[in-house]
């Protein structure tokens, strides 16, 4: 665009000649500006019409501008660490020396020379296969039932379900329940009822550690998932049930499958992702209950193995290989869950 030089503008005087000259000069500059702007707008419109993606970007350019800070932070604190972890998994790196490329040696060592890692895979799969589907199902059933209650009672029960997931002392309650002396609630109950004579060392016996971890993880996972699903249930338009009754929906099960579930797919997917990440990421619970490492590695999970090599032994290349395998497993499960939830209501 040509800059408008104010100093070259005709001086306004009382004479008609000077006034006409100023008007002619301003019209010429305005015409040039309109021509320049029309040309720029035509180019931008042409660029935005080339592909559907560009068209959407142009129409929602303000929203994309607002997303830039988040995308920058996401790239720096999520994408970059994942890529760096993947690259380090092919190296030997102990924080004291520069990374040294060793190819697939870390991955081969995990599966061929590390029996504790195989144990951690087995324990993680057992926990995930039990707490994942069961926790997801229980969260939905409880949310579905409680959603029918009066508002005040529903709010109170929602708080009861959600409070343990945000309470830092929740795990301490379970250590009291499964304490190894006669003062533990579980031992006290069993002794008083004559079921046992001597207290059971729940958290020091490898036969009980994994079942206890499963129970605690299942209990801890209900809070956020329950809150997410009950929010989805509240968002379903009640008029759709009336329309469904006109279209032939005859009972509550048909309402659930054809109306309720299809209208809360975002909440179902979000809850499933939380459940998967929580089931695969079990580590803090086993450490808090059974110590690190647990007796005979009975509660040892992939996350515990990652912590062992990453924060205790500082073998960062080996730990990065573990983290990469865990990340890939989570991605595969998330893709599978998306396909399953996508068929809901069909």
Residue ranges of each PLM-predicted region?
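A structural signal for multi-pass alpha-helical bundles of membrane permease subunits
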Residues: 56-346
């Amino acid at each position: 665009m040509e800059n408008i030089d104010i100093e070259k503008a005709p001086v306004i005087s009382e004479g008609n000649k000077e006034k006409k000259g100023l008007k002619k000069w301003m019209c010429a500059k305005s015409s040039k500006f309109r021509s320049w702007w029309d040309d720029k707008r035509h180019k931008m419109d042409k660029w935005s019409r080339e592909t559907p993606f560009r068209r959407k970007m142009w129409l929602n350019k303000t929203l994309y501008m607002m997303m830039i800070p988040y995308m920058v932070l996401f790239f720096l604190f999520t994408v970059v660490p994942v890529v760096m972890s993947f690259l380090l998994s092919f190296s030997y790196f102990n924080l004291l020396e520069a990374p040294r490329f060793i190819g697939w040696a870390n991955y081969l060592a995990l599966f061929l020379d590390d029996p504790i890692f195989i144990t951690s895979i087995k324990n993680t799969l057992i926990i995930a296969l039990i707490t994942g589907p069961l926790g997801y199902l229980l969260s939905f059933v409880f949310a579905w039932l409680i959603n029918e209650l009066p508002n005040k009672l529903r709010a109170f029960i929602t708080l009861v379900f959600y409070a343990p997931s945000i309470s830092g002392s929740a795990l301490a309650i379970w250590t009291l329940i499964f304490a190894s002396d006669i003062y533990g609630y579980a031992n006290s109950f069993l002794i008083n009822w004559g079921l046992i004579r001597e207290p059971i060392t729940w958290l020091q016996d490898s036969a009980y550690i994994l079942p206890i971890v499963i129970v605690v993880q299942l209990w801890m996972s209900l809070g956020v998932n329950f809150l997410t699903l009950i929010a989805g249930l509240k968002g379903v338009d009640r008029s759709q049930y009336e329309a469904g009754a006109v279209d032939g929906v005859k009972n509550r099960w048909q309402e659930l499958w054809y109306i309720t579930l299809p209208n809360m797919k975002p909440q179902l997917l979000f809850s499933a992702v939380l459940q998967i990440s929580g089931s695969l990421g079990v580590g803090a619970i086993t450490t808090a209950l059974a110590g690190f490492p647990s007796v005979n590695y009975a509660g040892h999970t992939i996350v515990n193995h990652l912590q062992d090599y990453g924060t205790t032994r500082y073998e960062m290349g080996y730990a990065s290989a573990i983290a990469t395998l865990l990340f890939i497993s989570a991605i595969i499960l998330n893709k599978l869950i998306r396909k399953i939830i996508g068929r809901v209501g069909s």
